[in-house]
UniProtKB/Swiss-Prot annotation:
One Pfam short name: ATP-synt_ab_N
Residues annotated as site: Required for activity: 363
Protein name (Swiss-Prot/TrEMBL): ATP synthase subunit alpha, chloroplastic
Annotated NCBIfam families: atpA (TIGR00962), PRK13343.1 (NF009884)
Binding partners and assembly: F-type ATPases have 2 components, CF(1) - the catalytic core - and CF(0) - the membrane proton channel. CF(1) has five subunits: alpha(3), beta(3), gamma(1), delta(1), epsilon(1). CF(0) has four main subunits: a, b, b' and c.
Residues given in the record as ATP binding sites: 170-177
Annotated keywords: ATP synthesis, ATP-binding, CF(1), Chloroplast, Hydrogen ion transport, Ion transport, Membrane, Nucleotide-binding, Plastid, Thylakoid, Translocase, Transport
Top-level EC class as recorded in UniProt: translocase
Membrane topology (UniProt): Peripheral membrane protein
PROSITE patterns: ATPASE_ALPHA_BETA
Species, as recorded: Piper cenocladum
Catalytic reaction list: ATP + H2O + 4 H(+)(in) = ADP + phosphate + 5 H(+)(out)
Length: 507
């Protein structure tokens, strides 16, 4: 039998003592007092920060929003069905952040940047805070490049620039989402990254939008962030900030981005729900006092960066739904005051068959012609005024029986101008095609045609120019000016095509 040697034992003990690493792990913990309706009240968590992420025993993550003297109010990022009274909670020391990378392009994700399209995980090496400060005054420059939407009514009269914030507002079922999705479709080949944020929408509506993008080949430069109507209020509240963080990632990498929020009024409702459950005092329409700040800090992140930061841009297009045309409600007035203009969609126009149903009279872009190419300014300068005069005259003509010839001519011209602004959904037009269309109407070439023939003729004219006179498109795209040569081509082609069209219609 072997005897134990004392020196060996002492050596082993000495080695073990040397290897001992004294690590003290301090964790800030608390206990659940109450849980329900997506809100948990926690006792403890004395050193938690406002907006800090906390983790519950069973894995649910929450955000500490209310820091009170005797408890902490936490909103849950999940259903929290497994959280029990008395279970422990620990502070993570982190503020809400998401991974970001080029790999997100073409994917559908949720507010936590997790994929929900069933196409596997998304690899990312960097991360960004969901809430980051907006660029300062010195970091920006004024908006000067156009963001073409492909819709004649917008690009000619209510132009949107890269880095602008333009509100799309109107009643339900007036084509607001269609205007936004057409804008995304028109960015194909324009080197613009698009982010579409669906907040509190029907899952079927989001699926329809994604299908449209896939069919038109727009998903390759688009990210869809979706939190549908059945998502927890916390995630609906976070979704727009997640979209903004992804768009910012590309903006600071010297790229142009466009982000659509559909729609911030649903985000405000989710925030109202959270605030009321946290027992914050309600204000107008029961919204909390800081609901303006909710939207202003989101929309202020849209910017056109200066040359030292790489001239990237982020254009925001929030969509707000009104109730029976009431733009004086709380959320619409808030968002109107934050944005640089609004596109107003009218249900009366929509029902009258004028689509997109844009009310040109009360829609405005506060950036104006700075966001247009020179060619468009030259051709469309008087279009808005002519349409406004026509609308006034049309209202007057309803009561007058006998009108003089000049008034009749002006009414006929106005009807044809209104007709050329009509467009089918998912059929955006290139800026060269828009210039041809507006020039044809504004210079009276459409006057011999019946109103019902206008659309058919314009399609024919644009096709003819594209195939037989490609030099017109080259002049506009290279110089961005409506030159005498470009006008000469149109003066030669349009009368010929009108004659040919009228002959075809007679036979």
């Amino acid at each position: 039998m072997e005897t134990l040697r004392a020196d060996e034992i002492s050596n082993i003990i000495r080695e073990r003592i040397e290897q001992y690493n004294r690590e003290v792990n301090i964790v800030n913990t608390g206990t659940v007092l109450q849980v329900g309706d997506g809100i948990a009240r926690i006792h403890g968590l004395d050193e938690v920060m406002a907006g800090e992420l906390v983790e519950f025993d069973e894995g649910t993550i929450g955000i500490a929003l209310n820091l009170e003297s005797n408890n902490v109010g936490v909103v849950l990022m999940g259903d929290g069905l497994m959280i029990q009274e008395g279970s422990s909670v620990k502070a993570t020391g982190r503020i809400a952040q998401i991974p970001v990378s080029e790999a997100y392009l073409g994917r559908v994700i949720n507010a936590l940047a997790k994929p929900i399209d069933g196409r596997g995980e998304i690899s990312a090496s960097e991360s960004r805070l969901i809430e980051s400060p907006a660029p300062g005054i010195i970091s920006r420059r004024s908006v000067y490049e156009p963001l073409q939407t492909g819709l004649i009514a917008i690009d000619s009269m209510i132009p949107i620039g890269r880095g602008q914030r333009e509100l799309i507002i109107g009643d339900r079922q007036t084509g607001k989402t269609a205007v936004a999705t057409d804008t995304i479709l028109n960015q194909k080949g324009q080197n613009v990254i698009c982010v579409y944020v669906a907040i509190g929408q029907k899952a079927s509506s989001v699926a329809q939008v994604v299908t449209t993008f896939q069919e038109q080949g727009a998903m390759e430069y688009t990210i869809v962030v979706a939190e549908t109507a059945d998502s927890p209020a916390t995630l609906q509240y976070l979704a727009p900030y997640t979209g903004a963080a992804l768009a910012e990632y590309f903006m600071y990498r010297e790229q142009h981005t466009s982000i659509i929020y559909d729609d911030p009024s649903k985000q405000a409702q989710a925030y109202r729900q959270m605030s009321l459950l946290l027992r914050r005092p309600p204000g107008r329409e029961a919204y909390p006092g800081d609901v303006f700040y909710l939207h202003s800090r989101l929309l202020e992140r849209a910017a056109k960066l200066n040359s030292s930061l790489g001239e990237g841009s982020m254009t925001a297009l929030p969509i707000v739904e009104t109730q029976s045309g009431d733009v004086s409600a709380y959320i619409p007035t808030n968002v109107i005051s934050i944005t640089d203009g609004q596109i107003f969609l009218s249900s009366d126009l929509f029902n009258a068959g004028i689509r997109p149903a844009i009310n040109v009279g009360i829609s405005v872009s506060r950036v104006g012609s700075a966001a247009q190419i020179k060619a468009m300014k030259q051709v469309a300068g008087k279009l808005k005024l002519e349409l406004a005069q026509f609308a006034e005259l049309e209202a007057f003509a309803q009561f007058a029986s006998d009108l003089d010839k000049a008034t009749q001519n002006q009414l006929a011209r106005g009807q044809r101008l209104r007709e050329l602004l009509k467009q089918s959904q998912s059929a955006p037009l290139a800026v060269e095609e828009q210039i041809v269309t507006i020039y044809t109407g504004a210079n009276g070439y459409l006057d011999p045609l019946e109103t019902g023939q206008v659309k058919k003729f314009l399609v024919q004219l644009r096709t003819y120019l594209k195939t037989n006179k490609p030099q017109f498109q080259e002049i506009i795209s290279s110089t961005k000016i409506f030159t005498k040569d470009a006008e000469a081509i149109l003066k030669e082609v349009i009368p010929e095509q009108i004659e040919l069209f009228l002959l075809q219609e007679q036979t």
